[in-house]
């Protein structure tokens, strides 16, 4: 069966320059009627790469690399479909922060999506299956979602159920208060979006265990009286001592994230999020030099926030015009220049 899958793919796509995972699964299951699950097809393709039968190359990928405190920091901008993560290896991403262009037309007439012209859709179970596949164990998924209303409450419930069914555990929800901005549409005035957080299985350990770390300091005769948990951590690390963590985000999540969005005339896109908001979320869900993903990158503020906080980033944007705006925004803000590459993975 394994060789049959590889040979069918090789023969069928022999005259083509490339094929996607989606095209491969369609060939095997619908054209060849082989009734094979997607994981097996993906595994056979990876084996084919190792054997030299296939070469995995993604075009439309732009890369910039910099040195930060002796660490290599990499950003990839991908002009592609954020729902297709086949270019990303299993369990290779330390966190996802994203805001999908949700298809709730009645709620798009006001607020920060009133000029929505991009491709809208509703999440399906397969979207969360892919998110779970690329996330490392315990890693966090952060979804920006609309404040609950009469037109979206069922969809928001579906999102939580689909995430749960694919191994993503509900962790917490924090509102983003948009400063003084208020949208007077619908049945009530609005100035919030929800930041919904899931973990891939049991949440990873990012929260400092203050009691254990103080005990380590005392055992080693280190005076840490009056110091914060973070200062104690730094001293233990300086002395090459173990630092202990508990399950959860890097700190207690706030009651609300309060950040003023830009005026519409200064935005790259209507739905863009403030860099400072993304920076705060990044610090809660990850560590420096880890790799984070935004599937629907829009303005590129996610990339800027990752760079500011010493994180590697992968940012995907499907719309060609928006992709160019994103790239220009990142290059101008960070004073960098991206180069287009053939990205082998």
Where on the chain are the PLM-derived regions?
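Conserved SAM-binding loop
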Residues: 326-327
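Class I S-adenosyl-L-methionine-dependent methyltransferase module
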Residues: 331-345
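Core catalytic lobe of class I
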Residues: 2-323
